[in-house]
Amino acid sequence: AALDRKELRKGREKLKTLRDLLAEAQVWCNKYVRFRDGNKCISCGTTKPGIQYCAGHFRSRGAASHLRFNLDNIHVQCNKYCNSALSGNISAYRPALIEKIGLDRVLALENDNEPHKFTSEEAKEIKASFKLKLKELDHE
């Protein structure tokens, strides 16, 4: 029975599309960012307990999908207010980001328009990399 489950799992892995693999990698990337940054919104600075925080992208995944896993581009935001209601609250995000990572790195993000098409192998590597980073952070 255990062998059958293992074979089933392998079979399911082979059926995953690039979209599935990127979604899984994004989940692990977001978990890592939330653990790395804690519960403090980069845009409004709130640390209120009981509200949901998410991994907000400075340059959105829709506008700059090549930056979707770039850690300079992703920071914790309060979900309901800054990330959703204010569509990322970029007017407050940018100054806080400059303070956090410096103007040069923010300008590099803003000027990075080189498209990148992720492959299935890259998506698997990205997922594994973020799982490992999260594990390392958890043990510190």
Residue ranges and their predicted role:
Residues 46-49, 73-101:
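Short Cys/His-centered divalent metal-binding micro-motifs
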Residues 20-31, 58-64:
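Short Cys/His-rich Zn2+-coordinating modules
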Residues 1-28, 113-140:
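A boundary/linker detector
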